[in-house]
Swiss-Prot record:
Family: Belongs to the ANP32 family.
Species this chain originates from: Caenorhabditis elegans
Entry protein name: Acidic leucine-rich nuclear phosphoprotein 32-related protein 1
Keywords: Leucine-rich repeat, Repeat
Annotated SUPFAM superfamilies: L domain-like
MF-aspect GO terms: histone binding
Bias (Acidic residues) ranges: 155-177
Bias (Basic and acidic residues) ranges: 219-229
Domain LRRCT, residue spans: 124-164
SMART domains, per the entry: LRRcap
LRR repeats: 19-40, 42-63, 64-85, 90-110
Listed GO CC annotations: nucleus
Region (Disordered) residue spans: 155-229
Length: 229
């Protein structure tokens, strides 16, 4: 497999780095960040999945970056997340699934003012932590979605197509939603979202919040609405 620097050159395709808004540098074999420059001033989405990363040392200055996917790496005590606070201050979503993270490794992320969503699934130490979700939401005040569920534990479905994707209109009903520009690159048809209803009854539109469990129990807000009627 090629190094990250080699993948970067290939992905760049002789484009001006300042014009690039999305980069996929997955499966680099050298286990370190390399090749990226501070010229990527308009980069909004960066993926470095399965690169064997143990640290984010060498992370470039990316002022427009809103979504970072660094899942399936070896990030842990030496992750150096403070570099994200300094070099990517506008981050709204970070995917950190399948790493080796602890709560202490993530404390510096609370300084990111717009951090809206984190995916920390499949981090063994976090999975064993008592009251893990409560502690994360308390530690990062701006956080609204953790591991695909909101602060109330209700699942938030997100739809992505290709390199970006767009949440359905109903799914983005929260006024304080992330509004990531990379989500605007493709659209789902109305048949797949708002107008979908299977035979035999009403269906919940895709892209809306639903209970994280499938036990059939109605959320409290729906029960309250029924009582009012």
């Amino acid at each position: 497999m090629p190094s990250m620097a080699e993948i970067y050159v290939k992905e760049l395709r002789e484009r001006d780095p300042a014009t690039v808004d999305t980069l996929f540098l997955d499966n680099a074999e050298d286990g370190q960040i390399g090749g990226l420059t501070d010229q990527l001033i308009n980069l909004e989405m960066l993926s470095m999945v399965k690169c064997g990363l143990t640290t984010l040392a060498g992370f470039p200055t990316l002022p427009a970056l809103t979504y970072l996917d660094i899942s399936d790496n070896q990030l842990g005590d030496n992750a150096s997340f403070d570099v994200l606070v300094k070099n990517a201050p506008d981050l709204k979503k970070i995917t950190l699934a399948s790493n080796k993270l602890s709560l202490d490794n993530l404390r510096c992320l609370k300084v990111l003012p717009n951090l809206f969503e984190l995916d920390l699934s499949n981090n063994p130490s976090l999975g064993l932590l008592e009251d893990y979700r409560e502690k994360m939401f308390e530690m990062i005040p701006s956080l609204k979605i953790l591991d695909g569920c909101d602060v109330d534990g209700e699942e938030v479905e997100e739809e992505f197509a290709g390199e970006g994707g767009e949440d359905s209109e109903e799914g983005s009903g929260d006024e304080d939603g992330p509004g990531l520009s990379y989500l605007e690159k493709s659209q789902f048809s109305d048949d797949e979202t708002d107008d979908y209803a299977p035979e035999g009854g009403d269906a919940e539109p895709r892209g809306t919040k639903r209970g994280a469990s499938d036990n059939g129990e109605e959320p409290d807000n729906k029960k309250a609405a029924g009582d009012d009627e």
